Amino acid sequence: MADDSGTENEGSGCTGWFMVEAIVQHPTGTQISDDEDEEVEDSGYDMVDFIDDSNITHNSLEAQALFNRQEADTHYATVQDLKRKYLGSPYVSPINTIAEAVESEISPRLDAIKLTRQPKKVKRRLFQTRELTDSGYGYSEVEAGTGTQVEKHGVPENGGDGQEKDTGRDIEGEEHTEAEAPTNSVREHAGTAGILELLKCKDLRAALLGKFKECFGLSFIDLIRPFKSDKTTCADWVVAGFGIHHSISEAFQKLIEPLSLYAHIQWLTNAWGMVLLVLVRFKVNKSRSTVARTLATLLNIPDNQMLIEPPKIQSGVAALYWFRTGISNASTVIGEAPEWITRQTVIEHGLADSQFKLTEMVQWAYDNDICEESEIAFEYAQRGDFDSNARAFLNSNMQAKYVKDCATMCRHYKHAEMRKMSIKQWIKHRGSKIEGTGNWKPIVQFLRHQNIEFIPFLSKFKLWLHGTPKKNCIAIVGPPDTGKSYFCMSLISFLGGTVISHVNSSSHFWLQPLVDAKVALLDDATQPCWIYMDTYMRNLLDGNPMSIDRKHKALTLIKCPPLLVTSNIDITKEEKYKYLHTRVTTFTFPNPFPFDRNGNAVYELSNANWKCFFERLSSSLDIQDSEDEEDGSNSQAFRCVPGTVVRTL
């Protein structure tokens, strides 16, 4: 068996394990440092204070908090210095006073220190403000439910935002006025930044209206009448512009002058910049969209920063405002004042508009030969700009009654005038209303085209024109498209006659238009129409007096005016109409009406040509003027307006 390790000669001497300790002070060749004390032994007492194992007391905890707070104050002051260096002075809300704005621009910290605190929670306000957080990032958005609200952003009562909670900074009792942090570039003016942020609110129009009232002291609605459509044109416009650069205000007068006939310009300066109010009358009518594009170019602002509406021309208060501000040094006026301002501010114009005279309206309708109610109302309303009686008519609450009365009276005068005239005077009266001389030859050429001898036609036409009994009716018959209706309609148009139709024969009043006519036309008589005339209208065709039933009026006795009839039926070839053969003079148009290659009528039967026809053949038709009338009519023009007597002193 092998020997145990570490044993030799078991049984003699020491046996088993033993510990050998060797101390090596310096290896061979090691140099010993001169400043090292080789003889001093390290006892370990110099490492006692490396770790503080003593109990933590309350005073040491306060020291740590004080140190942290001092560090936070130092960091906060450094950040504020950077903000003031790169962001500029903060801008306060427009709802504050000017003194507060100036104070805030000097020092935002000074503005935050106040003896009287503003309430932290405010009610809904018209304007919206942007605020800058302590960290300098982003915007603090304002939420609004149905309208635009303003919140006074300050430090919450729980000690501040997240950053301030970490630093432990106590800012209770201090409010910070915050400003917008531009992302692209630094704003040139704090006021420009404020107006741009204001225009981002939800109800832009309400914000602009509120700012206008704050600047000018009156509502913008009091000066304008709103147009719903942007395409409606008008010559006069009221424009309010916001956020305009001050350099444009100096040149705006020269820029607007070439485009306008009148301009009333007012400039005001507020914390946002320049605000413009202008009343302008352009040389041509413009729509709102056109005005917006024009002024946006001149003022160098977007069109959503402008309020554009036409002025309230019927308001005396609005006219007085423009008049009073126009004569003050607060406005610049170019051109002559509009007539609607002068009319409502000059005393004599105001007195002239106070009373409406129906006689002047009737005289105007009579002179212009207007008897339709709708036409009277429309045309007379357009005279309101220069006619005092028309302005009084527009201001009246009885316009419908006045229009109806005017049309009724005008028809009465016209009817009485017509019945008073002979056919000779009537033809001359109708010819005096037609301009131009015309040519009578196309009428004669058309009759020859229809194989009608002109001399026999002229003799029968003269008897018809004067309403000779048994010769009071002329019938133009023939195939379709031969020009029968064209020939008769042109003649009736010149003579100012009326047209009746058998389609209304079921009514007792279908012949009522004959009462107020000088001549008449029955177009396209069919078989039932001829039968009706043969049965009931023989006396009327004779040209003798007969009674006519009128609606809502008693029967009236009249002599039938000269009557023209067009038809495709030749009654001279019908034996059953033998009683009409002697009462109706018949002419046949057998040939189609000719047209040129462009579709125009070869024979023009215009009013001017008929005028020349009657003037040329007046002696043959027995309608020539007498010797007393050759020098002109000595009758006085009709006048329904009472005259005035000029009394001499």
Curated annotation (Swiss-Prot):
The keyword Isomerase applies. A motif (Nuclear export signal) lies at residues 106-115. GO terms for cellular component: host cell nucleus. A motif (Nuclear localization signal) lies at residues 83-85. One of its GO terms (molecular function) is DNA helicase activity. It is found in: Host nucleus. Its main location: host cell. Residues 138-169 are annotated as: Disordered. ATP binds at G478, P479, P480, D481, T482, G483, K484, S485. InterPro entries: Helicase_SF3_DNA-vir, P-loop_NTPase, PPV_DNA_helicase_E1_C, PPV_DNA_helicase_E1_N, PPV_E1_DBD, PPV_E1_DBD_sf, Rep_E1_papillomaV, Znf_lg_T-Ag_D1_dom_sf. Pfam families: PPV_E1_C (PF00519), PPV_E1_DBD (PF20450), PPV_E1_N (PF00524). SUPFAM superfamilies: Origin of replication-binding domain, RBD-like, P-loop containing nucleoside triphosphate hydrolases. Keywords: ATP-binding, DNA replication, DNA-binding, Early protein, Helicase, Host nucleus, Hydrolase, Isomerase, Isopeptide bond, Nucleotide-binding, Phosphoprotein, Ubl conjugation. Residues 187-353 are annotated as: DNA-binding region. One of its GO terms (biological process) is DNA replication. Residues 452-602 form the SF3 helicase domain. ATP-dependent DNA 3'-5' helicase required for initiation of viral DNA replication. It forms a complex with the viral E2 protein. The E1-E2 complex binds to the replication origin which contains binding sites for both proteins. During the initial step, a dimer of E1 interacts with a dimer of protein E2 leading to a complex that binds the viral origin of replication with high specificity. Then, a second dimer of E1 displaces the E2 dimer in an ATP-dependent manner to form the E1 tetramer. Can form hexamers. Interacts with E2 protein; this interaction increases E1 DNA binding specificity. Interacts with host DNA polymerase subunit POLA2. Interacts with host single stranded DNA-binding protein RPA1. Interacts with host TOP1; this interaction stimulates the enzymatic activity of TOP1. Belongs to the papillomaviridae E1 protein family. This is Replication protein E1. It comes from Human papillomavirus type 6a. The gene is E1.
